[in-house]
Structures are given as structure tokens and as C-alpha cells.
Amino acid sequence: MSLIDPRAIIDPAARLADDVQVGPWSIIGPDVEIGEGTVIASHVVIKGPTRIGRHNRIYQFSSVGEDTPDLKYKGEPTRLVIGDHNVIREGVTIHRGTVQDRSETTIGDHNLIMAYAHIGHDSVIANHCILVNNTALAGHVHVGDWAILSGYTLVHQFCHIGAHSFSGMGTAIGKDVPAFVTVFGNPAEARSMNFEGMRRRGFSAEAVHALRNAYKIVYRKGLTVEAALSELAESAAAFPEVAIFRDSIQASTRGITR
């Protein structure tokens, strides 16, 4: 029995693995590649060039690989690349890249993108991230591994969201969020570190203690960023987790959320 509903529209130039399932009324355009074990529900639109890996599930009414609304976009061939084991829930919109950046929007592996979230052009979502309902990322946003963006989080273009960070519901992020930091509010403010996330992922007590002290150095001692980074050097040499925190601050181009 065919795994593609006869009411779906599949362009002859699309390339689907033999066991890909496609529901009724979905439309898959040319230059779309979908890997084995992936399930496309009903009423999904996928436009190429788009590469979707293995064992993903895309729910109804999602728009995947559409042109960017960036006014500079003139129809250049740009891409969307999605890895493996991602869940993309109802009504999600994901746009392809632009030639002004890498020409590619990238989503890694094992991510949960919940209903009505938006991922803008040229954004990069790493692995094991959660974007809760109605989260919206502008163009060129980078989200690190294990980050969680709670519902209605808004992220300004070019912001970097660090690994293991967390945003509260309705947060408006306009600056970079360092790794492990919890932010909340409009505009976003740093509140603490994501200790619950560290606990769930099995961080050692020593690493958590070192990160707690690192947070105090950056956010509680009244130091400049440069002075705080200098003071973190010894701890960063001893704990890779502190090095990740320090490096995410050092790499910031928009300034960090304070």
C-alpha cells in the first residue's frame, strides 16, 4: 500500500525515501529531499531547495522552506536543511536563507518546534532545542544546543541564544543570551542560570557550583565584561562548562543580556 495519500501533490522532481509518509492535501515541490522514516501530515507545504533528514515528523498546516520575506531577497537559490529526529508541530513556518548570509537556514537534530513557532531566514537551530508555542525568531538568529525558548518568546535578528539557556514566557530578547543563563521579561533581563536544565542533564555538582560562581562574577560583582572575562580564566581552564559560558560572552556581537 502506498504511504503517500493520493490527494497529496508531489512534484516529480522531489526525492522521497521509500518509506516516507505524506498525508492528504500536502504539497511537496521540486528540489525537496526527504529522508527515510519521515512523516508528513496533511496540509503541509514544503518548498525547495529543502533537505529534510531521517525520522522527522511534520504536523499539519506547517509551511517549510518558503521564500524569505526579506526585502533584499530577489529570488536567489537558497536552502533549508533539517537534520534527523525533529518534531515540527502544527502551523510552524520556516523560511530558507538569503545570499546576504550563508544562503541557508539550518535545523539540527532532536529538536521540538511547537505549534505556530516561526524560524526566520538564515537562522541556525542546533540540537535538542525546544521552541515552545508561538516563539518567533527573526532572521540570522543562532540557538545553541539544549536551549529552551518558552511560549511567545521573541528574538531580534542576529541574536545568539547560548547552549542550555532558558527564556521565560513572553520574553523579548534583543541582545545575546550567554550559555546556561535564564532570561525573562520585556526587554529580557538575566535572572539566574538554568540549574534545572543542568540537573536534568546530569551536570556534576562541582560543575554547577563553578557555573554559579561564574554567573556571580559576570552579573553580581559590577565588573565590566572585559574584567569579568579575565576573572573567569582560571575557572574556565578547570571546567569546560565555564569555558562554554565564557566563550559565549566573548563571542557576542550584540552585547549580552544583563
Swiss-Prot record:
Gene3D superfamilies for this protein: Hexapeptide repeat proteins (2.160.10.10), Udp N-acetylglucosamine O-acyltransferase, C-terminal domain (1.20.1180.10)
PROSITE patterns the UniProt entry points to: HEXAPEP_TRANSFERASES (PS00101)
Subcellular location(s) per record: Cytoplasm
GO biological process: lipid A biosynthetic process
Reaction(s) catalysed by this chain's protein: a (3R)-hydroxyacyl-[ACP] + UDP-N-acetyl-alpha-D-glucosamine = a UDP-3-O-[(3R)-3-hydroxyacyl]-N-acetyl-alpha-D-glucosamine + holo-[ACP]
One Gene Ontology CC term in the entry: cytoplasm
Pathway(s) of this molecule: Glycolipid biosynthesis; lipid IV(A) biosynthesis; lipid IV(A) from (3R)-3-hydroxytetradecanoyl-[acyl-carrier-protein] and UDP-N-acetyl-alpha-D-glucosamine: step 1/6
Keyword line: Acyltransferase, Cytoplasm, Lipid A biosynthesis, Lipid biosynthesis, Lipid metabolism, Repeat, Transferase
EC numbers on record: 2.3.1.129
Lipid metabolism listed as a keyword: yes
Regions annotated as coiled coil: none
MF GO annotations: acyl-[acyl-carrier-protein]-UDP-N-acetylglucosamine O-acyltransferase activity
Family of the protein in this entry: Belongs to the transferase hexapeptide repeat family. LpxA subfamily.
Function description: Involved in the biosynthesis of lipid A, a phosphorylated glycolipid that anchors the lipopolysaccharide to the outer membrane of the cell.
Assembly: Homotrimer.
Classification via HAMAP family: LpxA
Name by which UniProt lists this protein: Acyl-[acyl-carrier-protein]--UDP-N-acetylglucosamine O-acyltransferase
Organism per entry: Stutzerimonas stutzeri (strain A1501) (Pseudomonas stutzeri)
